[in-house]
Amino acid sequence: MEKYQFIKQVGDGAYGDVIKAIDVKTGEIVAIKRMKKKFSDWKECIQLREIKALKKLKHPNIVKLLEIILERDELFFVFEYLENNLYESIKDRTKLLPETTIRNIIYQILQALHFMHTNGFFHRDLKPENIMLVGERLKIADFGLAREIESKPPFTDYISTRWYRAPEVLLRCTYYNAPIDIWAVGAIMAELYSLKPMFPGSSEIDQLFKICTIMGSPTSATWIDGIKLANSMGFTFPNVQPPSINPLSTLLPNANQDAIELITDLLQYDPLKRPTPLQALQHRYFKVSIPSSILLKPNFIELSNKYLIKNGYINNNINNNSNYSNNNNNNNLNSNSENLNNVNKNNQQPHSPQKIQTPKPKNSFLRKSRYSYLNNVSLENVNNNNNNYNSNTTSGYYNQKLDSTPRLSPRIVRQQQQQILLPLIIQQQPPPQSQPPQSQPPPQSQPPPILTQQQQQQQQQQQQQQQLPSKTTIYHNTNHLNAPIPPNHQRGISPQFYNETTNNSKL
């Protein structure tokens, strides 16, 4: 760690502390996370989920990992330094945030979650303290509790800060998955409008009561699994009927109707009914002008959604919903997407949202060669409903296994294309025209030679002798018939063959 000079400690947690430092050579300010656990070798270090997640998740809305250092059994993560987080920006604020600012923040959080979930990870500890701000750009940090979507449950029941914890986690469910991040986004969005936590419970039971007070208690019709979880732990939901008028309209008077609808969708009890990040991004709440500085290159959304379509992680039986309409109301949508709308007309599966024209980022994971199979994507028709997740089996891409097929290099892809196309090209080639054989003149018959009378008689005698059977040929091969049959004679082996083999064996 001689490369860095420590400045001050800026944070402390259960798993490690964060130190502000400076690179001695370059003068760059960095944030170093020092793990409290001791590690003897690299084999033990690479098993950390945080390392697995940060190595794979490279995105403009995710904090950048610069390097990992193991020194004297201490493990250090070196990140880019981001001074402010969302909690510090709103805790001492007295004036409400503009709606455009809230929209831009939630939009970037959903972009990051969409990238994380489609790459097989969910955060599990989403809260304002872990959302870093640098100008208009937002970045999610602290992946210490991140898990892979395809990892096998049970999971830890005590995760994330209690105020942003999903109901299924509060009920000690160990089979939760990525929708818990969606619940946290809904709680954060409501807090941005009110500048105070939406559900500030003092305990898990108090947290559930505060949720029921605002959202109403779940029923067997709205969340049958939640009723079963509550009964298994001896908990009974309070008898709070959902009000006819959404209470969020009263609690968040500065939020428009679209914002109230989106928060209500994000805070649904049943995790299977919560929208995916991609569906939330298509809500009409975002059908306004978004600053180009926070928009991502189309590939960030296009590639991930094409991956979902290709592997069937998006439910095809989703009906239309006005909240997720396909109207092209966003002025920032890329006009070039019209040229791609005809690519998948025959494909009845839903497609990703329309492209957004932004400068091409420098991230290496956007190289076209690695995603060459995802280039031509139609962006018109989108999976538009967030309510039709109620099925007996787990639907959506949350609880599906992600494709683990390794990406192929362009050279191997070209070789495979040649192996597929070459037989087709050969079949399409016309067969060679067969030329008729050239007619040859018939051979001229030569006249028979003139024989004398004596020669003719000799020739006739030779022909008569050839037609008569010979005595020697008739009885020539009958000597073996009188040979004695051996006692061990087998069917299919003649005695003559047996005598010859026995004589040879004696020799």
From Swiss-Prot:
Q: Which reaction does it catalyse?
A: L-seryl-[protein] + ATP = O-phospho-L-seryl-[protein] + ADP + H(+); L-threonyl-[protein] + ATP = O-phospho-L-threonyl-[protein] + ADP + H(+)
Question: Can you tell me which residues form the catalytic site?
Answer: 125 (proton acceptor)
UniProt biased composition (Polar residues): 348-361, 471-481, 491-507
Q: Which Pfam families match?
A: Pkinase (PF00069)
Q: Which GO terms describe its molecular function?
A: ATP binding; cyclin-dependent protein serine/threonine kinase activity; protein serine kinase activity; protein serine/threonine kinase activity
Q: Cross-referenced InterPro entries, in alphabetical order?
A: Kinase-like_dom_sf (IPR011009), MAP_kinase (IPR050117), Prot_kinase_dom (IPR000719), Protein_kinase_ATP_BS (IPR017441), Ser/Thr_kinase_AS (IPR008271)
A cellular component term, taken from the record's GO annotations: nucleus
Q: Where is the composition biased (Low complexity)?
A: 323-347, 381-399, 451-470
**Protein kinase domain boundaries:** 4-286
Q: What is this protein called?
A: Probable serine/threonine-protein kinase DDB_G0268078
Which SMART domains does the UniProt record give? Answer: S_TKc
Specify where the region named Disordered lies, as residue ranges: 323-364, 381-404, 428-507
Task: Extract the PANTHER family matched here.
Answer: MITOGEN-ACTIVATED PROTEIN KINASE
EC?
Answer: 2.7.11.22
Q: Which UniProt keywords apply?
A: ATP-binding, Kinase, Nucleotide-binding, Serine/threonine-protein kinase, Transferase
Q: What residues bind ATP, as annotated?
A: 10-18, 33
- Would you identify the family this protein belongs to, as annotated? Belongs to the protein kinase superfamily. CMGC Ser/Thr protein kinase family. CDC2/CDKX subfamily.
Q: Spans of biased composition, class Pro residues?
A: 429-450
For whether the record's keyword set contains Signal, the answer is no
Gene3D superfamilies assigned to the protein according to its UniProt record, in alphabetical order: Phosphorylase Kinase, domain 1, Transferase(Phosphotransferase) domain 1
